[in-house]
Design a protein with these regions (language model features):
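Charged (often Lys/Glu-rich) extended helix/loop segments that serve as interaction or gating elements
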Residues: 1-126
Length: 126
């Protein structure tokens, strides 16, 4: 979802601070690029923010990107900091992880489900 105002453009993305906390926690920079390069249109400056509704829920600020709503983005160099520092904040499922090796893409961890989150829960005896 893109939200453009007179002073700032926002790309509200599926990724959030619960997936990659480093930008919110200590302003870590991770390159964020569109998976498919657009031939049409021009790059605009965006803040890439998540849906968690916290002022610190961002993955990138002031990024020049040629994107439209629905585009798939790659967060580069997240590496071991992704899952190891992720959480279920706001009951969000942990993200899937992919590894890119040259031109091969491998799913190395499936996206978590609500059932995964609740697996260890127990109901008190009534």
């Amino acid at each position: 979802f893109l939200k453009c105002t007179e002073h700032k453009n926002f790309a509200i993305i599926d990724g959030a601070m619960n997936d990659l906390i480093r930008p919110a926690l200590y302003s870590a920079y991770m390159e964020i690029i569109p998976v498919d390069i657009r031939e049409e249109g021009e790059a605009r400056c965006f803040d890439l923010v998540g849906p968690v509704c916290e002022s610190s829920d961002f993955l990138g600020k002031d990024r020049e990107l040629n994107i439209e709503a629905g585009d798939l983005l790659a967060v580069c160099s997240a590496g071991a900091y992704g899952f190891g520092m992720s959480s279920n904040y706001n009951a969000r499922n942990r993200a899937a992880e992919v590894m890119v090796d040259d031109n091969q893409v491998h799913l190395i961890r499936k996206r978590e489900t609500i059932a995964d989150q609740l697996r260890g829960e127990a109901v008190l005896p009534g």
